[in-house]
Amino acid sequence: MTTQAPPSNLLPLNPEQLARLQAATTDFTPTQLAWVSGYFWGVLNQQSGAAVAAPAPAAEVPTITLISASQTGNARRVAEALRDDLLAAKLNVKLVNAGDYKFKQIAAEKLLVVVTSTQGEGEPPEEAVALHKFLFSKKAPKLDGTAFAVFGLGDTSYEFFCQSGKDFDNKLAELGAERLLDRVDADVEYQAAAAEWRARVVEALKARAPVAAPAQLATSGAVNDIHTSPYTKEAPLTATLSVNQKITGRNSEKDVRHIEIDLGDSGLRYQPGDALGVWYQNDPQLVKELVELLWLKGDEPVTVEGKTLPLSEALQWHFELTVNTATIVENYATLTRSESLLPLVGDKAQLQQYAAATPIVDMVRFSPAQLDAEALIGLLRPLTPRLYSIASSQAEVESEVHVTVGVVRYEIEGRARAGGASSFLADRVEEDGEVRVFIEHNDNFRLPANPETPVIMIGPGTGIAPFRAFMQQRAADGAQGKNWLFFGNPHFTEDFLYQVEWQSYVKEGLLTRIDLAWSRDQQQKIYVQDKLREQGAELWRWINDGAHIYVCGDANRMAKDVENTLLEVIAEYGAMDAEAADEFLSELRVERRYQRDVY
């Protein structure tokens, strides 16, 4: 339907002004037009002496609070898309990152939507830990006046699939809130499920919340300060790998690479604490092995996202081959009627255990079958990029980005296996070769705004990466705050990552203290948490001086051990019981003085 413009003599604009306005707004979305309407109304009201009649008070429009709890950016993208959908439907919405949400106001929420991922062993994403703890504490209020919906993102290769979403959904209902929609648990291929859920949420909320006037939309705090980049996960930058240097010794059990990527004149920006997303290709030899095991040729046509590709090309570029899941094992067993795998079907624990220990290609080798190409594609998950903590600051390296990559290598019955992305960077991209990358911003792992604030950095293994970026930034800023690094690895002589750089920072006085834990250099294993305990009194003094604490690395063991040790130190030197120590650390987290980048 076309709306006819009124006669020009009835308009308050002359033809030239009208033409300029139409040209300026020709490509605006309905949401942007609504915002502009409210913006001009605000400008008019601010003009001194403007003789404008005050509009009649509008009926109060309830705000939909949309909480984004993201670990790798996917939950944030779903939440942003839902925000745009709600604004397009003229609903009043406020999007807030879980780390910024004042959770004690939750009792006042009328309409609440949570989009959350899960990390580690079923834990909430880092930015949602404080909210999660609050809801599960004795302080959580009754939520009888709240209606809610939850969308969970997860990965079926992990045992506690979408556990954070399940936790929020169950706890909100337990506290008396009304469930608007059944929770959705989405796997790594979440886009279709998210689009369907968003449409249902919009319809459910339209029935609950009246449409807001444009000015009300514009003043509702609807748009959060979310980063935008010229390149994204969906449209990555094709950059150049300029340096691939092994930084562990020849006798090390680990293969760790320092990777430098030239961003050219792309204008791609990042901050210390951000992650680099890397799109990789599977090893052609792995593709060939899998195809041959299934008695296929590799040139069979298959359909991927509406395009027809040869099977081998589809497997190399579009499907996950290095991570098996319980679902894949179960579906393969059912499809092939495998005598060795069928007994696992229905036993979640056994399926999970088998998938964790057996790559897809070895599952096919141990339980051979013949599948057609489309059946194989139907079993597999789409390839997803890997995220690496950035190990550089643009204040020092300008148009480069550095990452520290632990290359995954192991054997299955004498056959060499490797991680998909790590071996791609280490083995298959030549220097000056192309690699597709994007920045995943992480505002939950940031240096203190005040350069005089002390910083405590705890990062064993490749967890050292963001702290290299931190120190480059502190050096460039001339920051006067003290810096203390805890680092650990198996052997001093083989595994001291960036040793010369850390020694230089110590010599210059920028790195105030460094404590090193070498787990295999003596009979008794020593880890970073042991060094924390050993330095407990001094650690407590730094905390009392306002230090910010950062932890980076393994989520499943190290991060938990470090947190337990921090609680012990707080309890002992702060003269607190366990409950008070936990409350103290939670408060540090809320104040952004305890931040973690764990994976």
From Swiss-Prot:
NADP(+) binds at S519, R520, K525, I526, Y527, V528, Q529, D561. GO terms for cellular component: cytosol. GO terms for molecular function: flavin adenine dinucleotide binding; FMN binding; sulfite reductase (NADPH) activity. InterPro entries: CysJ, CysJ-like_FAD-binding, CysJ_Proteobact, FAD-bd_FR_type, Flavdoxin-like, Flavodoxin/NO_synth, Flavoprot_Pyr_Nucl_cyt_Rdtase, Flavoprotein-like_sf. Alpha(8)-beta(8). The alpha component is a flavoprotein, the beta component is a hemoprotein. This is Sulfite reductase [NADPH] flavoprotein alpha-component. It is an enzyme of class 1 (oxidoreductase). FAD binds at residues 322, 356, 386-389, 404-406, 410, 419-422, 599. Residues 64-202 form the Flavodoxin-like domain. Belongs to the NADPH-dependent sulphite reductase flavoprotein subunit CysJ family. Residues 234-448 form the FAD-binding FR-type domain. Binds 1 FAD per subunit. Coiled coil: none annotated. Its EC number is 1.8.1.2. It catalyses: hydrogen sulfide + 3 NADP(+) + 3 H2O = sulfite + 3 NADPH + 4 H(+). Transmembrane segments: none annotated. It comes from Klebsiella pneumoniae subsp. pneumoniae (strain ATCC 700721 / MGH 78578). Keywords: Amino-acid biosynthesis, Cysteine biosynthesis, Electron transport, FAD, Flavoprotein, FMN, NADP, Oxidoreductase, Transport. NCBIfam families: cysJ, PRK06214.1, PRK10953.1.
